[in-house]
Amino acid sequence: MFYYPGKEQKVCDICGVKVGGQPGEYPTVLAGTIFYAGHKIVKDEDKGIFDEEAAEELIKMEEELADETGNPMMAHIMGESEEAIIRYLDWVADVTDAPIIVDSTEAEVKVAAVKHAQEVGLAERVVYNSINASVEDEEIQAIKESDCNSAIVLAFNPMDASVEGRMKILTEGEEGVSEKGMLEISDECGIENPLIDTAYTPFGSGAGTAYKVTLAVKAKLGLPVGGAPHNVPSAWDWLRDFMKKLKEEGKEEWAELAHESSDWGSNVVAATLCCDYLLFGPIENAPAIWPVVAMVDALIVEANEDVGVEPQVEEHPANIVR
């Protein structure tokens, strides 16, 4: 299994949730997305009105799975508007003590979340998603002026999707894209807990490289690394055509299994490569993801026993599920 004796591995402590370290020392942290676009529990995505009972059941489901396996959780909220993201943030903060990943397709929405978090004393629980090559000045300023010290740092290089290109955008920047590396920007923002996202792209568009760069980040930077591998099969043309064919043949269950196995499998590959955290997609998938990642974590501990790696926390899958 993978082990990095030549590079000290950073461990980020985000409100008691530890992310990083040598493979096998700490369990993989898992985050399912809630309030995503089209989420059936959301009644008004602009105002942030949602079925609170259903949402709480989903959050508590993740907490229960975390307790049962030893794999900690982070809440991952998506917001379509400033009003919505603030409402989601306040509500989730009351329901769980977990760190909260703040996410949106709009920069101003994330900025509003950070500013609000600072006002109400939640900034240290926020994980900003993300510092990337398109990060706007208002985002940088908002993070600087807050107590938010955790962020996902994206290794997406639109000019070079190779391992070298992704590492370069992190450490140096890229001509025509960013004069500074993402880690330098992260430092300037006061980020003490950088979580590298290898930028998983759809299958056929450099997805394999996103998996491979996991190893480079651990070996060369020693930083916590992960991402959203469920993006890999999300735009897989062959799978889409195959599922369509199965449905036309009346094999609906086969089609559903084909989709689910590809989605879950993308996360298992990442976990096997010793990712430190996973954004596994819709929160409803939690019961399928948690046990298999716990199994992988326990196997990694067994594989690394001969190099002296041991779990650094009592609540580790290796101490619970095997």
UniProtKB/Swiss-Prot annotation:
InterPro entries, alphabetized: Dihydropteroate_synth-like_sf, MeTrfase_MtrH/MtxH, MtrH
Molecular function (Gene Ontology), one example: tetrahydromethanopterin S-methyltransferase activity
Signal sequence extent: none
Annotated EC: 7.2.1.4
Keyword set, alphabetical order: Methanogenesis, Methyltransferase, One-carbon metabolism, Transferase, Translocase
Enzyme class: translocase
Keyword flag Membrane: no
One of the GO BP terms on file: one-carbon metabolic process
Pathway noted in the entry: One-carbon metabolism; methanogenesis from CO(2); methyl-coenzyme M from 5,10-methylene-5,6,7,8-tetrahydromethanopterin: step 2/2
SUPFAM superfamilies reported for this sequence: Dihydropteroate synthetase-like
Catalytic activity, as annotated: 5-methyl-5,6,7,8-tetrahydromethanopterin + coenzyme M + 2 Na(+)(in) = 5,6,7,8-tetrahydromethanopterin + methyl-coenzyme M + 2 Na(+)(out)
Family, similarity comment: Belongs to the MtrH family.
Its biological purpose: Part of a complex that catalyzes the formation of methyl-coenzyme M and tetrahydromethanopterin from coenzyme M and methyl-tetrahydromethanopterin. This is an energy-conserving, sodium-ion translocating step. MtrH catalyzes the transfer of the methyl group from methyl-tetrahydromethanopterin to the corrinoid prosthetic group of MtrA.
UniProt subunit comment: The complex is composed of 8 subunits; MtrA, MtrB, MtrC, MtrD, MtrE, MtrF, MtrG and MtrH.
Protein name per the record: Tetrahydromethanopterin S-methyltransferase subunit H
Native species: Methanopyrus kandleri (strain AV19 / DSM 6324 / JCM 9639 / NBRC 100938)
Gene name of the encoded protein: mtrH
